From Swiss-Prot:
Residues 319-367 form a coiled coil. Inner membrane hub protein that plays both cAMP-dependent and cAMP-independent roles in twitching motility. Regulates intracellular cyclic AMP (cAMP) levels through the activation of adenylate cyclase CyaB. Plays an essential role in a number of virulence mechanisms including type IV pilus (T4P)-mediated assembly and twitching motility as well as cAMP-dependent virulence gene expression. Also mediates type II secretion (T2S) of lipases and proteases. In addition, mediates the cAMP-independent localization of multiple T4P structural and regulatory components to the cell poles. It comes from the Bacteria. The gene is fimV. It is a single-pass membrane protein. Residues 140-177, 237-312, 372-445, 785-816 are annotated as: Disordered. It comes from Pseudomonas aeruginosa (strain ATCC 15692 / DSM 22644 / CIP 104116 / JCM 14847 / LMG 12228 / 1C / PRS 101 / PAO1). Disruption phenotype: Mutants are incapable of twitching motility. In addition, loss of FimV dramatically reduces the levels of the PilQ secretin multimer through which pili exit the cell. It is found in: Cell inner membrane. This is Motility hub protein FimV.
Amino acid sequence: MVRLRTLVRAIAAASVLTSGMAHGLGLGEITLKSALNQPLDAEIELLEVRDLGSGEVIPSLASPEEFSKAGVDRLYYLTDLKFTPVVKPNGKSVIRVTSSKPVQEPYLNFLVQVLWPNGRLLREYTVLLDPPLYSPQAAASAPQAPVSAPRATGAPRAPQAPAPVRTTAPAGSDTYRTVSNDTLWEIAQRNRTDRVSVPQAMLAFQELNPGAFVDGNINRLKSGQVLRIPTEQQMLERSPREALSQVQAQNQSWRGSRNPAAGSAGARQLDATQRNAAGSAPSKVDATDNLRLVSGEGKASKGADKGGKGDSKAIADTLAVTKESLDSTRRENEELQSRMQDLQSQLDKLQKLIQLKDAQLAKLQGQLGAEGQGAAQPNAALPDASQPNAAAQAPAQPGTPAAAAPTPAPAGEAPAAPAQPPVAPPPAPAAEKPPAPAVPAPAPVQAAEQPAPSFLDELLANPLWLAVIGGSALLALLVLLMILSRRNAQKEKEEAQAFAADTGEEQEDALDLGKDGFDDLTLDEPEPQVAAVAPQVEKTTAQTSDALGEADIYIAYGRFNQAAELLQNAIYDEPQRTDLRLKLMEVYAEMGDREGFARQENELREIGGAQPQVEQLKSRYPAMVAVAAVAGLAGAKLAQDELDSFSLDDLSLDDSGHAAKPDAAGQDLDDAFDLSLDDLGGDDVQADLKSDSGALDDLTLDSDLDLAASTPADKPVDDLDFGLDFAELAETPSQPKHDDLGDFSLDLDAPEDKLSDDDFLLSLNDEVPAAAPADNEFTLDTEAAEEPALSLPDDFDLSLADEPTEPAAPEKGEDSFAAQLDEVSAQLDELASNLDEPKSATPSFSAEDAAVASALDGDADDDFDFLSGADEAATKLDLARAYIDMGDSEGARDILDEVLAEGNDSQQAEARELLERLA
């Protein structure tokens, strides 16, 4: 059973592996489009969708059990996530992940489950959420101005993207001409690739176009300048951390040059955009803060004079926006300060989590890439954006381990507008110190991004190999199952044969009944002339061993009908097989088919050579013996009707009218007298009858016939088998004629002795002479004795055709008899050779012979009455015990019920006891 379960599991695993890889649906990377404190908006790419529709792909959050197996906490706010499959017009399918509430956690770790018609997918995703630092709507209302202040105002607009977005440079163009209100952040964002962060692109533009910036500061881009667009390789010359540090340093330098009187109490840029939650907050300012306009120091740009007219209007607009946002920022300042402490602790935990998840993410995602590094940059600059009252924390932050977590944009790298309240710039050494320690080696990251494919990866990427391996494994398992099933079947067959053999022996022992009530049963001895056939039966037993073996198996399981059918088919093929017929007799005895038992017994008698086995079966199944005897009588009647035989069995006649020699009683008597008159020629018999009429002295027929036979004293009879030579019969004119002899009885002079009632078949359709010599007297006496000694059945027909006293003149009825005798052929010569005794010798029957015949007759009557009265009930009890030993409870109950109805008190008590045992 354990092996079978293991095989089933292996087959199921191979089937799942083969069918799942055949379709090839997969989950790609996740792309984040929202920031912290905003409703989640992300997309998960679907790979190898092929012909699947949106309705066939069902994504959802995994079950708690799957979270538990993966070792991931299933937090409550994850239940707000909604997964929607989207098929885009370009054929690219994604799963859109959204939430109805703003996400206030810095990162999300969850399992996505995707169901489709051919299988199921599970994948873990970790999303880092950055706080929104700036929105492009901040300076939407500001007019265009050629002065440097408005140009610098647009610089902070770029950090709106929290995660790197794939952008491509304009096709067919390697340069870009700046216009009014352009910022380097926007230009760099439009021309960078996914692997390049915005700070890296900004510094690459500055390095390639140094003359386009005032004082070499990225926040002072000149209008109308033609910028050469750097390549991706040039943008990747600096690491994201180093580029971020340099951008922060230039932002602080630019703020310091713009606000020299602000001192060390530098304030953060204010975010005047409308959003649900403020992404940053400035430090507290004194109530005496004032706003004053200053001109930019250093060289002016070439287009600075052109925008002088719009300066006043731009400043007024910016001042109005600043005043509106100042009140709200003051109210949120205290709340943000407390939240920053929480965020700092969460960042520390996040650093450890990222270190632990690096290996797992590399295996599951396949490519880590610069996208993760770009996403970690805002977190690195988060302390600088959220702690305005600690100016020294900004340069120190990149040196901490938190800088390893990639974030998309730096915090506070550009001022809001000239209308900003005056703040003091941080010390110069603090601004220049961060770049030094922030020089990580990007080589290990790129090595992790593109690991060398292993053999297992190549195998999993090739569905054909997977199908071949799965099919081979399945075929091997099927072959193994077939071998095991054949072995089990062979083992079961051997066990069944062994069980059948043991059961057959037990049944033979159980059904081997004793000879309790059958000691006085006398059966006919087997004919001596066919006793030599037995060795032939043993010689050919092996030819039908298969049929006998199968029959034994059916018998052991109680399927007697199938066993009988099998044996009948085998007998039909080999009708001379006595062993098959013996086995069929045994099956009939088990089934209670008495007619079949008797029929097979008669056939075995005709074949010969199996009489001892038949007697053994009769002793085992005594209930079949009476039926066999009745079948024998029926066969005798049939033979009598067909005029096929003349039989005289166990005939013992006593000469009551004449004295017999005493030594005649010591003769060895033979109980069988069989005379076959089959195929006798009628013409020859008539000729013999006419040629000699002195063989029979006296023949008297009446409704009740008494037969008295006498023999000369000087001629003893050695054997009761004698032949009748119809040529020696003499006519008897004084003998009366009878048209019909319905009752034919032979009465002996001794009234107390009975002869055997064996078949006495005598069919003589010819005239019998009435006279015979005195020394060969054979008299049929019409005087009735005191009681009949031998009574034959009513249908016993001994017909003697009426004839006139003169045999030479037959009546008309003899013409038909002669016509019938014309058809007799083969056995006349053989019969004539056997009937060679002297004409004057007739059988001699003594008183002792009659006594022996009477005793045999009485014994036979007693033997055939063994099923009457109490003997029948006792036999049924024995049969019931045999059925119980065989396990046939139903058959035993039926027999015991009959014993309760027919038996005496002791037998009924024993039957009840057996029934209680069966209950």
